[in-house]
Every structure is written in structure tokens, then in C-alpha cells.
Amino acid sequence: RGEEKLVFSLGKYGILWKHDRVSGEFKGYKETVFQNAFTDIDSVTGRVTYREDIQNAKLNEWTSACPSSAGGKDWHSMTYHEPSGLMIAPLSQTCLENAAREVALVQGGGGLAASRKFFEMPGTDGNLGKIGAYDVDTMEEVWSHQQRASFHTGTMSTGGDLVFVGDLDRRFKALNARTGEVLWETRLGTSVQGHPVSFAIDGKQYIAVTSAVGGTSPRTVPDVIATEITYPRWGNALYVFSLPEE
């Protein structure tokens, strides 16, 4: 950005990290959702101090942490909206009680080897889904859009100041990339998942997105927290949208 060459990352702890992408030098961070897994983050070096009770937990000993194993931010990509200098990310606001348990080592097996109890993140008023926009210069939150249903796609921004995203409640939305205002939405056949894409044919722009069942960690959490949100267990499809001809 400008003369600086930067790289940003955001993972399950919900912390947006900023580094020099040439030297790796730490430049700053922002907590995008409530987290209590780290007791301290050094503002100069970025070094984190992890909670000792989590590090030293014994088998069948319960600990509580935010965010849950769904994130923070899961695998869904965030988008950089260059005209406004905003990094816009899909976020998940849930927490977790967790206890390690002994499991048999079986070839081809796998799993979390833990007992889990999900709960709503404090201070969110029950909103599991959040879109957060962050100024890449100051690392401050400029706007957020929060809702009960969790988001299950990456965010995609356009040169026309739009950002597209989809959620578990089957809604595909276009927001104002500068303010977060919802400008348009439609409801698809089942939960919206994957990555919205934009493409053009003969000068006409199209927006495409997939609906699907399965997929991401945040999908399973509302099954025990937001049981009122339901969606068909079928309906995998590709949807393509465009503006009508004038």
C-alpha cells in the first residue's frame, strides 16, 4: 500500500495480523472478535502469551475459550477493497468448552479427540455471524455487520464499492463496502457456501456463488446454538447473477 509492501493474515483466533511482506517485520494487529486464549499480545513484537490452563489441561479436564474451534475466521477468504483501504472479513462469534479425551489410534481414523460444548460469544447479543471492515493503515474497525446466522462464504469486493457474502440462512447479500449497509439480498435453495466470484463476458459483469450442504466448521455450531435456523439438506447449485439490461 503506497510504498509499503504488506501482508495481512487472519485465522481462528480472530486476530488480524499485519507484517512487512519482504522482511516479515511485525507491523500491528487487531482483535476482530472477543478472544481469551491469549493473555497478552506484545504491541511491539507481536509475541503472544498463551493461557497456561489451556496449555496444561489434563485428560477430561474442561477449559473454556473464545473463539471456538470454528473461529474467529475459518477458511473463508477475506477481501481487500483497495478504493477504501479496507480489509473486509467474514467472522464467526462462538465460544467453546473443551475437554481432551483418550481415543484409540485407528488407521484411517481421525477426529478432534475432545468433548465440546459450544456457546454464544459474550457481548454479541446472540449474533453468530459478523462481517468486519478494518482500515489497513490504522488497523481500526470502520464498520461491522452482525446477524444471527453465521457466514459461510468468503467475502468478495468490487470496484463498484460492493462486497458480496453468503450465510447459513440461505441469504446471498451485497453490502456497501465503505459503510456495511445491506443494499441487496436474495435467498437461495440451501446454505450459501464457497467463494463468490466475478467475471465478465462481452463486457457484461456476472457474480457467481454456490449453495451446498456440508463444508465448514461454523455450519455445525448453529445446530446446537441457533436451532431456529434451518435449511434443506439438498440443493447444491451454482447461481449466477447480473444486472438487467437497460
For each feature predicted by the language model, list its residue ranges.
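Beta-sheet-rich non-transmembrane sensory/scaffold domains
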Residues: R1-E246
